[in-house]
Amino acid sequence: MRTITIVGAGEAGTQTALALQELGYGVTLVSDRSAGQIRSGSITSSQCVFSGALDVQREVHVDPAQRAAVGIGSLQLNVSGTPSPIAWTAPLDRPALSIDQRVKCAQWIEEFVARGGDFRIEKVTVRMLEDFAAHSDLVLVCTGKGELGQIFARDRRRSSFDRPQRVTAVTYVRRPEIGGTADDGDANLAGEGPQGTLRFSLVPGVGEFFTFPGLTVSGPCQMMVFEGVPGGPMDVWDTVQSSEEHLEASKRLLKEHFPHEAEAFADAELTDEGAVLRGRLTPTVREAVGILPNGAAVLGLADAVVLNDPLTGQGSNNATLAAHYAAESIRRRGDQPFDEAWMRETFDEFWRGWAQWSTGWTTSLLRPLRGFQLDLLAAAQEHPVLASSIANGFDDPRTVFPWWQDEDEARGMLEWAAHQERNGFDVRDFRSALGQFATGVTVVTTRSADGSRVGMTANSFTSVSMDPPLVLWCPSKRAPSLGDFEASTHFAINILASDQHVLSRQFATPAEDKFAGVRCAEGVSGVPLIEGAVATFQCRTVARHDAGDHVVYIGQVEEYTNRGGEPLVFHGGSYHATVRHPEFAR
């Protein structure tokens, strides 16, 4: 049995431990606190876990107290301090949840131990890491606290800041009429707004406030997060000493800068003495491989190497996805050594598929909003499909690129939003209805005129004819690489295997090099063939048909491979694996 030591029992450490334990590895989880100490201690974050990360948690049967938690089904945005105030509400495609890390991390540790896991309580030093590395096949560091944070060098290329961009304060409260038991989960915690809403208020140059329902150690609560520009009028926390002073400062900031929220929290009370947190952090990306004094290498995960400001609520999502990417990479490694090259490849895969987008999204909001970005927020008041796209960017940040960062792309997005609403349908509901049709997932590839490899994720693929052998797929007219497919004579359909969901995400991003880290062979006319796909079809383009906002490509199959295996399935906005129907399982 291969052995893995995980240092740090936060969201990333505990989820990785549970995932690897289920895969049959010998796992040691090391924390500086027991489950009981975590549960009775102070809050550690302002976590809000969106649906994509929740899907990952459920894969390892991590489902703590979710029945008692209030789902977050929409995002409400308010922008003041601008010539024209902005206010709108948009639904999330799927609900988010916020469960106090004191609740879930303590429960996950207990679950890990109940399954037979080796849990140790120690304050880990670099010297101890050397000992762990000598007696384990792999060491994962999931905390950047103390001297452990110094073993991972700052990545200057990927780090945008060298100092804190916000002064952060977090407050968990309950109101007297809400009470503190899980049975009160249907109570309206959101003042004038609808229950189950993440309310995000922004004053350019001053700071932000956001609040959402959650579940803490005493039951349902409302979580309050203040993000003040350093040196500005919301930078008031240095003189605060006690929990009560913290609560009073929270209410005072609402009256002064977010008066539309003040009344809802006038009678708010702390959920417990540990329900406050304040501080400053410098958003930083670090090298994922740490080299210890004795030459041993360890792999950093989550906040240890990608530390984002809480402004966009990405921390818990980053931790969950980092755990997922790491566990998948470890599983695929089999009996091969966990060497430095593999460690870098594992992190780069996570960075390409997820972390670069969550980091870029957070960085864009930490910086002063540009004129076209304010225009997008304002236009969302008139275009619900645009508001929905912005709101769901908190769930999957790659979906807001490139139009959130590029002025020309932003204009195109505005035109698209206006056009989408002319058909009279609720675009979100129509897309959800179409999503009820389960499909496989493909990556369609070709070569550009200059010989570069081109690819995009698509599930709009189907067979057309057996004689001659024809297939079709339908790219969007807004796809950046559409011109490359128009100029090429051939393309390849690569049907992804169940364990290739990482590639599905990677090829669905606007990244410059989507093929980074992807093993490919070369097919007809040089089209890339992705290794590990359950089937590939090398096609000559025989027809293109205009079809609304998409183009229908018909290709004649010239060569194909049928490797077989379990395909990746997409349904209802998330990935699935094939399962034999129980009535036909016998």
Regions found by a protein language model. Name each.
Residues I6, G279-S358:
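Conserved mid-domain beta->alpha element of the FAD-binding
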Residues R33-V79:
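N-terminal FAD cofactor-binding segment of flavoenzymes
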Residues T312-G313, E328-R422:
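C-terminal helical "tail/cap" subdomain of flavin- and related membrane-associated enzymes
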Residues H419-R586:
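Basic, polyanion-binding surface patches
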Residues A153-R199:
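Central beta-strand plus flanking loop segment that forms part of the substrate or channel wall
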Residues D63-D155:
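Conserved N-terminal helical subregion
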Residues V7-A9, Q21-S42:
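Glycine-rich FAD pyrophosphate-binding loop
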Residues L198-V276:
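Conserved FAD/dinucleotide-binding core of flavoprotein oxidoreductases
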